[in-house]
Amino acid sequence: MPVTDTTEKRFEDDITGYLLSEGGYTRNADIYDPKLGLFPATLIRFVQRTQPKTWARFVNMNAVEPERKFCTVFNNACDMDGLLHVLRHGFKHRGISFRVCYFRPESDLNQTDAGHYAANELCCNRQWFYSKHNHNSVDMMLSINGIPAFAFELKNQFTGQSVENAKR
């Protein structure tokens, strides 16, 4: 009878493998910016692809470092309205409305809505170093369009770990 690998790494491998093969996720090759709390290149790419005219207006109004400015404006909107609200409804800046993700349309009749939904980038990252203050990490993080949405520690009862270990 083969020995079952019950290590945390194997657990991570299994979850990551499933998300990549069956869940529509990819690995995020872009660089995470802990100061912004985002994968800025991923978020900017999504906005440029799905809202090119809106992005052009924003760049015209913010000619110096528009990408950095956009990420700052996004973070300010999240601080004011909350991340879930911004994910669901987007945000406005100086009269310009932005969406940072699109939900599944009720039908595929509207090709624009279907295309926007298909443009979402779902990514999983392992050993996510989230802090600008230290080198702490969590086992896995899921993001949508460069926005960290769900981070979690994996613990395995077969190795004697519990939720208490994750709290440390």
Regions found by a protein language model. Give the residues of each.
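An alpha-helical interface "stripe"
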Residues: 1-168
